[in-house]
Structure formats: structure tokens, C-alpha cells
Amino acid sequence: MEDKSLVTLKKKTFEVSKFSNLGAIELFVDGRRKRPKYFHRRRETVLNHVGGKKSEHKLDVFDQRDYKMIKSYAFLKIVGVQLVVTSHLPADTPGFIQIDLLDSRLTEKRKRGKTIQRFKARACDNCSVAQYKVEYSISTQENVLDVWKVGCISEGVPVCDGTYPFSIEVSLIWVATDSTRRLNVEELNSSDYIEGDFTDQEVFGEFMSLKQVEMKTIEAKYDGPYRPATTRPKSLLSSEDVKRASNKKNSS
């Protein structure tokens, strides 16, 4: 049976926060380190005029203030993602826009995909919203300020005055923790995570759609079709590359 004082604390915290308390949840404090056992926060950022080969737009969902609070933990985990795509194109506009949430550390050499979450919307949709419950972890020894970026692909969409009139709003719910175990629904709904019951889609949606949080807007100008950056090892140079290099050397 759950301790009555804990029930009271959960109820009080839930009512006071109204899903808008984005600071640390100090329930069970690690006595040795004098810090919250878990740190739970939601952040939001907006990209305007997206669509182009500048695929890895920095999200800026973390700042130095956040880093100081999480660096003593072992892991940073994304547990929720919301993507909102806003289009200002006419209803008969063809094509699609594809949004990729990327891990900028992952490369071809790691034999892993960079895409954490992918979302596709019709170009003519006035507003498309998608919410995902995810489980993605990185070590806090990584450069967490620059890890997550957004990639955009516009397929068959006409360019208007050199730009695509799309805006993307990206929201992340993340948790700082020392746990090496995979977070599950029971853990997210435990007393260490007083931000709502994420098994309830309505509550999850209410939390993700908050407007009290400060948003950062980034102008991402169109610069050609989106092409994920790829590099070829020197061992895979084609005969044309070798010939071109040889001619350049002989001419000099």
C-alpha cells in the first residue's frame, strides 16, 4: 500500500504544477550528492522556412543552464516527442514534407541510422501534429547541447520566392537519470516522475501542447533539396577521382 504522505505529495505537486513546472522534481533526493534523483523537463523550439539541404538544423533544446543541472547524472533520455508542422500553402499544393529528428553524433561509420523519429505531412495541410512516446538515451559525457537536430525533406513541393513556407515546432520531454535500465511506463508513472500519466493520451497531449514554455525561433532558409551529408572513405575513391587527382598533380 502506498504511503499516504507520498500520495499527498503527488497530489499536491500535480495540482501545483498543472503540467507547467518545468524545473527539477525534487522528491527523492540523493543524500550523498544532495540532488534530485531524477530531473524531468520539456523544451520547445521552432524552425521557420524549412526545407533544404541544410538538413541538420540545431534544435537548441538545451542550454548551459540545463547542462549544469544534468551533467552530474549518467544519462539523458528522451521520453516524448511532439512535431507540429504548419504550412501556408494553398489547399491544392502537391507534395509532402518529411521531418527527421536526428542524432548528429551518428555517422555511416557507426553502422547506425541517424534518424530517431520520422514524420511525413502533406504540403497543403494547414497544421499537422504528431506525438511519439520514445526511449532514446545518451551519456551526459557527450556534447548534449549539440546532439539533436532536425532534418527536412520537401518532396515535389514548389518553391515560393526561394523558400518553403513551412514552420516546424519540435517539443521534447527528457529525463536526466543514473539508471541504466530501459524506462518503462510504470517508471514514468512512478513517484519519481510527477508530470502526468503518460499511458493516458489525453494527459500526454495536454502536457505536450503547453504554451507557457518559452520558445526559440530559428530562421532556416531554403538552400536546395535536402541531402543527408555523406562522405566516402579514401579506399572507395572511384577511378574518375584518381584520374582527376593525377591530372591535377601533373598540371602543377
Swiss-Prot record:
One of its GO terms (molecular function) is RNA binding. One of its GO terms (biological process) is transport of virus in host, cell to cell. Disulfide bonds: none annotated. Keywords: DNA-binding, RNA-binding, Transport, Viral movement protein. Pfam families: MP. The keyword Disulfide bond does not apply. Transports viral genome to neighboring plant cells directly through plasmosdesmata, without any budding. The movement protein allows efficient cell to cell propagation, by bypassing the host cell wall barrier. Displays RNA-binding activity. Belongs to the tobamovirus movement protein family. This is Movement protein. It comes from Tobacco rattle virus (isolate PpK20) (TRV).
